[in-house]
Amino acid sequence: GHAPRMGCMTAREPTLERLAVAESLLLGPYGLTERHLAAALATMAEHRIDDADLYFQSTRHEGWSLEEGIVKSGSFSIDQGVGVRAVAGETTAFAYRDDMSEAALLDAARTVRSIAAAGQSRRVKVGGVPQVAPAHVLYAPTDPIGTLDSTQKVALLEKVERLARAKDPRVVQVMAGLAAEHDVVMVARADGTRAADVRPLVRLSVTVIAEQNGRREVGSGGGGGRFGLGYFQDDVIEQYVDHAVNAALTNLESRPVP
């Protein structure tokens, strides 16, 4: 078989980097190679189809929170799967699976082929036990979850609390949350083109409660974006904390005391 055409994808270096990252996270751990993708696409092409593609996705999420001075590692989840789509005339057939083995891929491709052959547009969830990736979890260089270790994540939230309490003695309670997400997508089309996207997302939030004369008010601050946890340097944290504390104090001072 001829080598897959990359289209104009060689023009932008980051695109190739993203593709390499996606392949290492979405294909490598499950023993999938370019050969398996081509085989799955060829399986669908046995029926007359106008277009076909494979869609791989993995989303990893981690959350940490601080309350009452204690940091809890909240949630950690990995959501992943593969979707197979074929278009024949007016018909669109789509099947997806949670597991990403070679068998699952071919199974989904055969399901799509039979739907397309029957001439009905349908979406099908193909059975199979969700597959857990091999134990050594790979972090892409762009994965924000891997940019700080757990000790650093704890230290970051403790710093938020320390700064907030130091701002004003009326601050009686501090809650902080840290969330990181890494979304990797890869599409393989029947014409040989391959595309990938790697999207990190991080967020830091802080909520403070200030108390004066028995009355309590709440203020919050925070922010984030599509980058690593290294973004949360002292000046950024300071800004979020200032915003939260000032909001709580403004609320305290704005209402007349009866």
Pin down the residues of each PLM region.
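Active-site bordering "gate/hinge" segments
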Residues: 2-258
